[in-house]
Each structure stands twice: as C-alpha cells, then as structure tokens.
Amino acid sequence: MNIHEHQAKAVLKSFGAPVAEGVAIFSADEAAAAADQLPGPLWVVKSQIHAGGRGKGKFKELGSDAKGGVRLAFSKEDVVKNAKEMLGNTLVTHQTGPEGKRVNRLYIEDGADIATELYCSLLVNRETGQVAFVVSTEGGMDIEEVAAETPEKIQTIDIDPSTGVTDASAAAVCDALKLEGQAREDMMGLAKILYTAFCEKDMSMLEINPLIVMDNGHVRVLDAKVSFDGNALFRHPDIMELRDTTEEDEKEIEASKYDLAYVALDGDIGCMVNGAGLAMATMDIIKLYGAEPANFLDVGGGATTEKVTAAFKIITADPNVKGILVNIFGGIMRCDVIAEGVVTAVKDVGLQVPLVVRLEGTNVAKGKQIINESGLNVIAADDLDDAAQKIVAAVKEAN
C-alpha cells in the first residue's frame, strides 16, 4: 500500500526524522490559512499523488509553459494562486502514464535553503534477504537515470538483522554519501531512525529523494515516498487509515475485496493464473510471442467459484483487454472449480474476446468436461507454450 508524501513524513517524524513543517490542504480556500501557519518567507506547494516525477510533470488542463506539480511560492498570494491552478487538474508524470492523475490534495511546506541534494532509500535486498540502504550522491533526479548512466554512483549497504544499524554501518552510509561535520553527525542518527521505522512499520520501500544538506549543515528529509507490505497491514490499523482509494486502480480495489492478487498493466491480453510464479511465467511467455499482458492476476490456491467469477469479471472490465488466457495447474486449486467460475462469469458478462484455457492437475478431466459442455467458444490448450501461442494468434486474427 502506498501513502502520500505528507503522510509519509508524518510517519517518519513520529520516529524522530527531521522534516519541514507543512500542512495538507484539500481546497484553495485552505491555502492562505496553511501559509499563515508556516514561517515563510518561502513556501513549497506540492501536488499529492501516488507517483514520482511531480516536479517535472505537466498539467493536462494548463498550457505547455505552465509550471509542474511542485512549485515555489514567495508570498501567501502565490501560495493561493498556485493552489487554485493545481487542485482538481490532472498531473501527468513519467510514472502516471499519459492518462495522469487528478490532484485532490496539496501539501504546503516550509521552504529550505539547500546546499546539497542526496538520495537515500531502504528496501529488502532479495539477493541477501536483508534490509539494505541504497544511497547516492546524485539526489534530486530520477534514480533510474543514475542507475542507467552512472551506476557506480549508487551504493548498497546491507544491514544485518541480528544487529540492526550499528555505528559502523551508519558510518558506511555516511561515507557513501560523502558527508562530513554536522551533516555526518545528523546522518549517523537518521540512518538508525529510518531503519527502525522501516522494520517496525513493515515497509517494503522507503525512498527519500532528495535527502538534503541545508546551508546550516543539518540534514532534512525533503521528499518521502513509502510503500507498506500489504500482507502486514493487519498489524498496523493506523497505517490502514492513511489509505487513499482515489489513487488506486478501481480494478485493484475490487480485487482486494476477494483477496485476489491483481496488478493492472498496459497490455491487451488478460491473464488468470493460480500461483505467483506461474503467473509471472505466463506473462513472460506472452511477451516472448510478441504480445503484452494486461494484468497480473493470481487467484491463489483456495479459490472458490465465486472468487474465480469475480476475477474473470475484473479482467473483462478492462477495456484494453482483447483476449484472455486462463492458465491453471491444479494442486491445491481444483480445475473443476476454475472451470465453473469461468463458465459462470462468461455467462454473466458475455464474452466479446477470444478465450484460451489451459487446465492441468487436480480434477482436470472434470474441469475440461464442464467447459466442453458449456457451449462456450473456448480455445483449449495442452500446455503453457501452446496456450500462449494460441491466445496471441487469436487476438491478432480478431483485430
């Protein structure tokens, strides 16, 4: 689960991280009052959407010469003017896609005198199984660009879970960021704060870009992006309260009601699979044969007919879907349950696109019988390779 920048900063501040004072607003009328609460004379007006690249982004409704989603204001009048321009409009960044995201809230923040911009993030290093700091002296820009153009400027420091952040590992972070004096002293403490927050709140990613050194030598969290492990949210009702469903894909929200692992993608072949590994392999082989998956969807091992029906309806609700591949290897999951769910869903919503079904495993004969006797126009496949080729060919033929 993702949260907004102002929420992420509030979480980090509760652990002792240095952040600027700020106020979240939802209407232009609140902008002047927010500015009054902050000392000035510089304010920063920030669009709050679940996407990066806001500063370089552009609003659809404004001219090409209009400012982006993060703006400096040198008077309270400027704060109000920017708020009126930004709220309710659609911000397009490199992470939102061309459709952009509507800005429903802003964060008015006290400005800072920036001497140096750095990059600092925490995530789980899948190679070592440890939480790691990923840091760079190249802050304030897209870390993807740094990784592509100058990867040597990114350093990873793994943290031993049995010790947490020691003075030695905190010093390694400071060395990688080339910090000295007051900034180094601040970062020694901040590294421990960030690690504690990451672990205690079950975060999956914590990104600070930029982490700044101010003119007075102190460090400050200037921007913060936090994602939480969805499987651990039951332990954090305070974090659950921060969820903003207006920032989420409607299909993903619907999928969460049925405990379906669903992620919307940009392709045109819908996928319904059991098991995350098989789902990823299915997506890979679709790409191998020249097409793009429209989603990741794992129905899990204990799916019911109702759950499968819901999954199928979610896939067909995507207007970009031009074909559907159902790929089931039944171990815990029974093929007849999948078949019943598919048949029920198709009869409910109608089937306007090609459908390829590959079933193997528990009750496979019964599952195939259910589909064959349904009277539906379903293309049967014997294995994953055969299924991928058939759905790609069927979509090309239909379009």
From Swiss-Prot:
Q: How does it assemble?
A: Heterotetramer of two alpha and two beta subunits.
- Asked if the record carries the keyword ATP-binding, the reply is yes
From the Swiss-Prot or TrEMBL record, give the protein name: Succinate--CoA ligase [ADP-forming] subunit beta
Q: What does this protein do?
A: Succinyl-CoA synthetase functions in the citric acid cycle (TCA), coupling the hydrolysis of succinyl-CoA to the synthesis of either ATP or GTP and thus represents the only step of substrate-level phosphorylation in the TCA. The beta subunit provides nucleotide specificity of the enzyme and binds the substrate succinate, while the binding sites for coenzyme A and phosphate are found in the alpha subunit.
Q: Does the keyword ATP-binding apply?
A: yes
- Describe how the cofactor binds: Binds 1 Mg(2+) ion per subunit.
Looking up InterPro entries in the UniProt record yields:
ATP-grasp, ATP-grasp_succ-CoA_synth-type, ATP_grasp_subdomain_1, Succ-CoA_synthase_bsu_CS, SUCC_ACL_C, Succ_CoA_ligase-like_bsu, Succinyl-CoA_synth-like
**Matching SUPFAM superfamilies, A to Z?**
Glutathione synthetase ATP-binding domain-like, Succinyl-CoA synthetase domains
What are the GO MF terms of this UniProt record?
A: ATP binding; magnesium ion binding; succinate-CoA ligase (ADP-forming) activity; succinate-CoA ligase (GDP-forming) activity
The EC number of this protein is 6.2.1.5
Q: Which Pfam families does the record match to this protein?
A: ATP-grasp_2, Ligase_CoA
Q: Which reaction does it catalyse?
A: succinate + ATP + CoA = succinyl-CoA + ADP + phosphate; GTP + succinate + CoA = succinyl-CoA + GDP + phosphate
Keywords of this entry: ATP-binding, Ligase, Magnesium, Metal-binding, Nucleotide-binding, Tricarboxylic acid cycle
List residues binding Mg(2+).
N209, D223
